[in-house]
């Protein structure tokens, strides 16, 4: 048995024998099981059952489904932006950083969002939709793309803040941890988008609490913005890997490490 297999077996044992009630802990462990490469049977055993826990206004499954939807939208937008960059269709006039640096930032964020999506769906999260509509201008103008990214990541960070709060209320410490880890990354994306526009990267001492009641508030916002209308299809992991591997520095990781919690 390899070292990875030994570690996975040990983690699997911990997941299945925690002092917490088995049912509640497995809800919280589902993402860990999938994200760390544990055998599919264990991930399946840790699947969410769709029940609402005391103190939570939404089910864990609902929250994770919303998160997967947001990540799918982000991957779709960034993948198509990368395609446009490769084809020389993006006007970069007015950006405050060198173009190669901006390209590396876009590639890194694409990698991270796909990693988030894989992590969530590997544990059973199901996106509400997988086809999205974005303002056409973001695929041809770097400044407009950065403005859109800044806004979108503010919504993402706030949604993960709400998820963190709900999971904490439900006693799901692991899911609260993962929500924080992903949400913190989304906030760095917002800062990078602002820096590339020549703005103060982080202009707030605290992440905005946009959704004080439910994570579902993010769905309403994206619906109002028209993002959830059918349009561009989520490209899938293979296409994301291919565009990262076959262009720019030919690095499928895009320089990103710690690709699971």
Tell where the protein language model's regions lie, with residue ranges.
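All-alpha RGS (Regulator of G-protein Signaling) helical domain and cognate RGS-like helical scaffolds
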Residues: 2-20, 27-261
């Amino acid at each position: 048995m390899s070292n990875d297999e030994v570690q996975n077996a040990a983690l699997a044992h911990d997941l299945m024998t925690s002092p917490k009630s088995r049912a509640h802990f497995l809800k919280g462990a589902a993402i860990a099981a999938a994200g760390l490469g544990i055998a599919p049977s264990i991930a399946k055993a840790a699947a969410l059952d769709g029940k609402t826990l005391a103190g939570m206004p939404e089910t864990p499954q609902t929250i994770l489904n919303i998160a997967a939807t947001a990540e799918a939208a982000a991957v779709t937008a960034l993948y198509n932006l990368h395609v446009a960059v490769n084809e020389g269709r993006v006007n970069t006039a007015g950006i405050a950083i060198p173009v190669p640096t901006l390209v590396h930032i876009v590639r890194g964020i694409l990698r991270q969002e796909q990693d988030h999506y894989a992590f969530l769906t590997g544990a059973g999260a199901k996106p509400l939709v997988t086809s999205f509509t974005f303002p056409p201008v973001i695929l041809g103008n770097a400044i407009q793309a950065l403005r859109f990214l800044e806004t979108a990541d503010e919504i993402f960070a706030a949604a993960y803040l709400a998820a963190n709060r709900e999971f904490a209320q439900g006693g799901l410490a692991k899911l609260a941890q993962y929500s924080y880890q992903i949400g913190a990354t989304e906030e760095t994306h917002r800062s990078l988008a602002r820096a590339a526009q020549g703005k103060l990267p982080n202009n707030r001492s605290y992440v905005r609490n946009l959704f004080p009641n439910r994570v579902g508030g993010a769905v309403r916002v994206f619906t109002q913005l028209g993002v959830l209308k059918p349009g561009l299809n989520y490209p899938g992991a293979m296409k994301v890997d291919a565009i990262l591997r076959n262009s720019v520095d030919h690095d499928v990781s895009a320089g990103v490490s710690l690709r699971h919690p």
